[in-house]
UniProtKB/Swiss-Prot annotation:
Receptor for pituitary gland growth hormone involved in regulating postnatal body growth. On ligand binding, couples to, and activates the JAK2/STAT5 pathway. It comes from Rattus norvegicus. This is Growth hormone receptor. The modification Phosphoserine is found at residue 342. Residues 290-638 are cytoplasmic. A motif (WSXWS motif) lies at residues 240-244. The modification Phosphotyrosine is found at residues 487, 594. A motif (Box 1 motif) lies at residues 298-306.
Amino acid sequence: MDLWRVFLTLALAVSSDMFPGSGATPATLGKASPVLQRINPSLRESSSGKPRFTKCRSPELETFSCYWTEGDDHNLKVPGSIQLYYARRIAHEWTPEWKECPDYVSAGANSCYFNSSYTSIWIPYCIKLTTNGDLLDEKCFTVDEIVQPDPPIGLNWTLLNISLPGIRGDIQVSWQPPPSADVLKGWIILEYEIQYKEVNETKWKTMSPIWSTSVPLYSLRLDKEHEVRVRSRQRSFEKYSEFSEVLRVTFPQMDTLAACEEDFRFPWFLIIIFGIFGVAVMLFVVIFSKQQRIKMLILPPVPVPKIKGIDPDLLKEGKLEEVNTILGIHDNYKPDFYNDDSWVEFIELDIDDADEKTEESDTDRLLSDDQEKSAGILGAKDDDSGRTSCYDPDILDTDFHTSDMCDGTSEFAQPQKLKAEADLLCLDQKNLKNSPYDASLGSLHPSITLTMEDKPQPLLGSETESTHQLPSTPMSSPVSLANIDFYAQVSDITPAGGVVLSPGQKIKAGLAQGNTQLEVAAPCQENYSMNSAYFCESDAKKCIAAAPHMEATTCVKPSFNQEDIYITTESLTTTARMSETADTAPDAEPVPDYTTVHTVKSPRGLILNATALPLPDKKKFLSSCGYVSTDQLNKIMQ
């Protein structure tokens, strides 16, 4: 509803301006709402044409003044035609007496001045305007409510510092409180508001109210002129005083180049935008061109199995047998099993079990006919479960060939015949058990340990048949039993890794005790089992040492016609020296000679290094390589 009245009032005002001679306008404005008159006092003045109060102010809370307008009536413009009356309320009651204004001149025209004699603080005042007894306007207030101090005076500024580039500077603005306000005694407390701007600007920059009379202004451009103004008000009140005079701040002349640099602002924002866009484009191009490589870096493929000499397709197809075959061919892929091998403390000879007695033993095949022995030696069986065996045909070929070259001979014999003849060198110990020479043999072979499986095997033919066939052989009286061990016990291991062997023989404990028929044979005709390519040292010693003690009629010297069977010269040297001292000390045991493995000539053959003793002068050996032939052995035995 009020909005319609506002619009109506505005329309009437415009019409009054357009038609100044109209007499209906004052009557209409007189009916306007008092709310509109409070909103716009000028409307109230123009509506009635009567004088109205404009303001009342006290600059220092000790005196105050009130002001009014003249009005439209020319008769009221005559001095003294309008009177101001005031009254004070004491003890919550108005005095019945109204008093006229004490001073119409000191505050100016159309005003009334109340000095300190007529001013009372915290006491309400009521004032009214009258002309010829008619009430024109009235107003009520207290002095503390109308306090409006004078503007500050004495504005000044001081330069604090200048920035390093010489573009901006800091100043401090100071002023004095209005002289009318008794600020020093604390009768009134003022606060100040500062406004500043550049000369060419239209909008003032306002700072927060402060209580002090100085304030710093920062970052003012040195190439611009600035304006500063200040106004004051009583603390906790809303009415400010008028602004002080404008203070102009002009800095000294500065470098033009610095001003140009300040005016030029680098477009950092645009550069950042274009930079981000360019980096995004470059990343997109790189990712698009290198997408395969980036994919491999992020998700690397599973590596293809690459083994030298093996087709990867075999692994993909799962053909493990072919892969294992290829790995077995290449030496680099073969596993090293030698680290898992354990040391062998002593060597055992595995003889066939009792249920295999029907089969012929290797030694019996050797003692049979040449045709049978040659056929049997090819079928020799090595059933030692991985341990070294004396029944090794490969050693015969290698060792005999080496000894032939050392002796300067070039005879080559069949391995079957050589093993058969070498086997005839050692006689059966069972038939010599009751002979005088039996004790000496037992004392010479204490170092070989026989296994529980060592059992005597029957000969290829019967004992009777073999007895009748003995005279036709080169040896005089071979014995049927040939299960005599020619193994050497390992006694020590050298720091360099060599194996030290202890030679010797021990008569088997499981020999049959019931044989009464003894064959007469010379001690040098023992049935040596020549299943290896060398003579045992202890056997050679027994043949040499026992020869002087036997009767000439019963001793048939062995004739070693096998030119490819050898024994070591060191062993013969030792046994020869022992045979010389047999007369003086017939019961003394020869000191066993220890030897070491010199080298491996074949997968199952060994060459031994024996401890050699000085040879007697009367025994001259033609071979210097450590082996002698059967001819040389015959000469030594003579």
